Structures are given as structure tokens and as C-alpha cells.
């Protein structure tokens, strides 16, 4: 069977859900699952193989090591270290200190990797930057703002009582408390709807807490955001994803247009208020990055 090869690092809630999604839609010819929890990854692979047969998926699923990821066209990093998150604000940043060393260690092992790396591990804007700086990989994207944008469009579609595909709009900045909805450029059927868009912002901010209260951790939404991004980074379809990428001296979410797998920023015009909000998010992320544990080794300049 020919087709792309995708690696998934992490067999927790998001890794499991993503892997099941990859198998069900048969996006890749091979799926390589890597985790430090050997027994867990063996069980997950067996479960996915059963699923693949049941749904007649062409995807071959196997357990692997980090070295096997070099043979993948794309790698999704969904690892999460063991820690207790007691944060009541900036919840996604709660794992920064715990997750940064693990991201750095993986990045060192993947130095020179030439495929696309999609980072899901939170706080994603900080972790994507850490992975890119330590590994030197050129195609690193953080997953988060595209999930925020999907939620935004869904809530606005419900509010306006239209199908979601009639809504156009972006959420940029931090995947977290300082996300910036681009109200001024949001449209329904091509017409501006800034007033109605403003009405759903509170619901957008509350949605992650609603999910956590019900199932403990978001998993399906992030997995869907990864699947959508993989299709574009692998050049299977063209389109736009809001992804965390370099923005000045920080990383944060902006719209990226993919054509044949080639990315190009396509941020909409911003009002003065939206620009100030984006600058505030950048400043906060800049400060937060300085608080991360220093990587033990960086890639040579």
C-alpha cells in the first residue's frame, strides 16, 4: 500500500483519539505509534489493528521507537508528562515546566528531521517553539488556534442559525486565555457580522471548561484539528489552518494557507483593538517562555 506515513508520539487521551481517527479515515498508509509506556502502546496498537480490520481501513498500524519517526512524512507530538494541574487561570500553561524537558528530549532525537511536525502538547505555543528551537526542524506547527477557530465558527453558526460552512472567521494569538477572535473580519455569507460575532465570544471562552467538566480532558476536538492540518501539510488538500508559528520573536497562532503542502501566512486585516490584543498575547508568551527550564542542549547554529 502506498501513501503517507504518520507517526504519533503519545498514547494518552489525545494520542488514542487521534490514532483512531487516522485509522478510521485511512489518511495514512502506515501509522507508527511511539510512547514510553510500552504496555500501553502495545495495547493501543492491537486495539487499532482490530479497528482497522472492522472498518476495512488500509492503514497498517505498528508500535515503534523514536528512531522510526525519521521514516515518517509527518509526526504528531501529543506526549504529556505526569503532573497535577492545579491552575485555575491559564490552565493550558499549567504543564509548561513539566512538559518542556520531554519536548526538548524528543526534539534532540529528531534533529534534522525533514517532515512536518505537529505539536499538540500544551501550552502549545511554548512547546512548538521549544521543539523547533531545539530540533532545528523547519516545518513545525502548533495545533490550537485552528481548534479555537472551529469552535468560534460553530458557535456563531448556531447563533446566526446557519450552516457552519457559511461562516468565515479566525481566532488567532495564544491557544489559551489570550486568544484573539478576529471579529472585524468575520462574515456570514460574505457579509460582516461583528455584532453577532461578539455575542459568542463568552461561549467560546467557556467551551473548554464545559468539555473538561464532562470528560476530564479535550480529545476529539484536538484530534480533528490535527487530522485537518495533516491533510494540508501532506499536500492532500489545499486550505487554511490557524497554527502556531513564528511571529516576530515569539510563536503564536495565525492563519496559514497551504497550497500543495507549501505554507504561507494569510492574516486578515486587524483593527487597532485586535492588534493590541495580539501584541498583548505575544508579550505574555514571550515572558512565559523565559520561565521554561533551559534546554540542556541546543542545535548548533
Where are these regions (language model features)?
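Conserved active-site and cofactor/substrate-binding residues in soluble primary-metabolism enzymes
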Residues: 13, 36-39, 97-101, 126, ...
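Conserved N-terminal Rossmann-fold NAD(P) cofactor-binding segment
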Residues: 32-72
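NAD(P)+-binding Rossmann beta1-loop-alpha1 motif at the extreme N-terminus of oxidoreductases
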Residues: 1-44
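Short, surface-exposed basic-aromatic patches at helix termini and helix-loop junctions that form
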Residues: 23-25, 49-53, 129-139, 157-162
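Structural motif
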Residues: 5, 73-74, 116
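Long, compositionally biased stretches enriched for glycine and/or charged residues
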Residues: 161-301
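Rossmann-like NAD(P)(H) cofactor-binding subdomain of soluble oxidoreductases
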Residues: 90-153
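NAD(P)H-binding glycine-rich loop region in Rossmannoid oxidoreductase-like domains
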Residues: 58-94
Amino acid at each position: 500500500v502506498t501513501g503517507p506515513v504518520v507517526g504519533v508520539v503519545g498514547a494518552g487521551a489525545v494520542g488514542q483519539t487521534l490514532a483512531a481517527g487516522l485509522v478510521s479515515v485511512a489518511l495514512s498508509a502506515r501509522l507508527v505509534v511511539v510512547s514510553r509506556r510500552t504496555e500501553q502502546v502495545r495495547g493501543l496498537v492491537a486495539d487499532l489493528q482490530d479497528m482497522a480490520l472492522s472498518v476495512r481501513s488500509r492503514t497498517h498500524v505498528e508500535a515503534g521507537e523514536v528512531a522510526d519517526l525519521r521514516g515518517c512524512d509527518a509526526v504528531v507530538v501529543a506526549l504529556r508528562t505526569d503532573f497535577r494541574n492545579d491552575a485555575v487561570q491559564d490552565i493550558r500553561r499549567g504543564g509548561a515546566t513539566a512538559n518542556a524537558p520531554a519536548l526538548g528530549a524528543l526534539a534532540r532525537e529528531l534533529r534534522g528531521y525533514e517532515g512536518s511536525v505537529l505539536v499538540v502538547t500544551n501550552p502549545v505555543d511554548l512547546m512548538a517553539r521549544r521543539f523547533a528551537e531545539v530540533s532545528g526542524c523547519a516545518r513545525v506547527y502548533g495545533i490550537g488556534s485552528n481548534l479555537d477557530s472551529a469552535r468560534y465558527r460553530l458557535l456563531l453558526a448556531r447563533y446566526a442559525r446557519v450552516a457552519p460552512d457559511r461562516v468565515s472567521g479566525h481566532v488567532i494569538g495564544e491557544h489559551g486565555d489570550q486568544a484573539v477572535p478576529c471579529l472585524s473580519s468575520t462574515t456570514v455569507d460574505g457579509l460582516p457580522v461583528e455584532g453577532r460575532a461578539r455575542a459568542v465570544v463568552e461561549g467560546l471562552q467557556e467551551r473548554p471548561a464545559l468539555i473538561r467538566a464532562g470528560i476530564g480532558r479535550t480529545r476529539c476536538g484536538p484530534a480533528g484539528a490535527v487530522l485537518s492540518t495533516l491533510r494540508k501539510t501532506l499536500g492532500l488538500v489545499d486550505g487554511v489552518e490557524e497554527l502556531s508559528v513564528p511571529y516576530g520573536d515569539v510563536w503564536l497562532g495565525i492563519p496559514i494557507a497551504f497550497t500543495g503542502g507549501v505554507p504561507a501566512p494569510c492574516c486578515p486585516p486587524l483593527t487597532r483593538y485586535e492588534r493590541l490584543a495580539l501584541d498583548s498575547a505575544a508579550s505574555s508568551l514571550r515572558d512565559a517562555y523565559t520561565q521554561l527550564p533551559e534546554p540542556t542542549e541546543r542545535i548548533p547554529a
